[in-house]
Amino acid sequence: HTYAPSIETVPFQGSDPLAVSKEIRQYLTVHPDTYAIYTCSARFTYHISQCIRQLGIQDRIQVIGNDLFTESRQALSDGILRGVIDKKISKQSALAVKTLFDYLLKKDYPRSSCLVMEPEIVLRSNFQSHSDLQK
């Protein structure tokens, strides 16, 4: 940690969000001075948000989640999440399907072998105006 030597990273690994959430809940109980959590997937964002809500510690911990979906929007609104890294999964999927459709049916070859979809950082302060939230 060259940039922040006083920060200790504690990775939690596993593919079962419920099991990892339980492990994090236990960790937070033993280490109440934990300052922040970053979750790298939408599934884990949901479960960690639920854990923080149930523990009632949203005022003392900074949680950054991944992807905008109904529950992460609610967690932002409720102050459970401080921010979300929106990878625009639905737009990525739509672009992939459109590109494949155009290629297979229209013989329209993609202009590039790499299609870039820039992620966005959505914070509590700007999520109400975020374009993906407009219904």
Model-found features: residue ranges?
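Short helix-loop-beta junction
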Residues: H1-A4
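Conserved beta-strand scaffold positions in the cores of enzyme catalytic domains, especially
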Residues: I7-P11, V63, V84, I121
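Hydrophobic alpha-helical
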Residues: F12-E71
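Residue-level recognition of short, well-ordered coil/turn positions
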Residues: P32, I57, I80, K107-D108
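Short, well-ordered alpha-helices that flank and scaffold nucleotide-derived cofactor binding pockets
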Residues: Q50-Q54, D78, K98, D102
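Flexible loop/hinge segments that line or gate small-molecule binding clefts
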Residues: F69-S77, L81
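Short beta-strand elements at the ligand-binding edges of bilobed clamshell
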Residues: D78-S90
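Hinge/cleft segment of the Venus flytrap/periplasmic-binding protein
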Residues: K88-K135
